[in-house]
Amino acid sequence: MVRADLLDAVDATLRRYRNREKPFGGVQLLMIGDLQQLAPVVRDSEWSLLRNYYETPYFFASRALRETTYMTIELEKVYRQNDTFFLSLLNKIRENKADDEVLNELNRRYQQGFQPPKEEGYIRLTTHNNQAQQVNDRELASLPGKPYHFRAEVTGTFPEYTYPADEILTIKEGAQIMFLKNDVSLEKRYYNGMIGEVVAVNDSEIYVKEKGSEEDFLLLPEEWGNYKYVLNEETKEITEVIEGTFRQYPIRLAWAITIHKSQGLTFERAIIDARNSFAHGQTYVALSRCKTLEGLVLESPLRKEAIISDSVVDNFTKEVERNKPGNKQLSDMQKAYFFDLLSDLFNFYSLEQAYKRLLRMLDEDLYKLYPKLL
């Protein structure tokens, strides 16, 4: 999720290159997201500085955003789940309204010591990295056969903390994996978040398949770019420059992943371990990754303490509810935007600045060289 300081940095950049007088340089801004999911990441060392300028790290504390008139619209149709009963339970969790009845219904999915059938492709969602790593290491070690190691090819500048896949991928035949990218070929054989299995592997080749499928295919390495955006001084256009590349097979071991990494993904079957939830929205994100209630298994009973909500988000959401936009407000804002576009056609700010620079140059340089012009 975008932090307030990042949004203000976007504002500063747009003002610099477009229009200094208007928030975000006069650009129309569209932001899409869910505040009830995981909060923006802020280290303690960062917040010790940011707290002097912001009440909260959430985007709505942005100073630039507060200078604008914006409209908040709630999208209500859910596409991941079709079961209205499951949706009602998830919404109670999402809105921090989970009572004993909701918890009891969800805890029906608790299965002590559950051992998932290998062919069904269950994935375990954990709260911490070390938990997921332990599960994956244990499951990989339990497989027979030789482990194979594949090192990523990194060129140019590509910071280690932004690596999109393992620098050294270790797999065996039979390993459960998750794809990390969409297949851009015509075959469209895999997508980001799809669960699969390693069918065969040697020093130079990996054959994989989707879980539950009989059709396997040769997996090829994929390339990710580390991009930088620079301003072309001649054309005044922003151009994309690749600073570095990261090339690796687009998979990782996936008997378990963290809830944080699961955000945005959808699973047919998942085992949820939320007993150590520590962040706003964490439990909701974990539960809502699963398409059906039947595909969900709880590794431990769900407790109220694991459902953590941020009062700052709750207050913002209530304010949005109280000020739902109507058709008139939408129409008025559309008219105001078109008026701004029209006004920009008669904005001579850049000419005014050029004229001021000319006067300064005459005053500071020309008259010193040619004093008789005075």
Where are the predicted features?
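Conserved ATP-binding/catalytic motifs of P-loop helicase motor domains
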Residues: 1-374
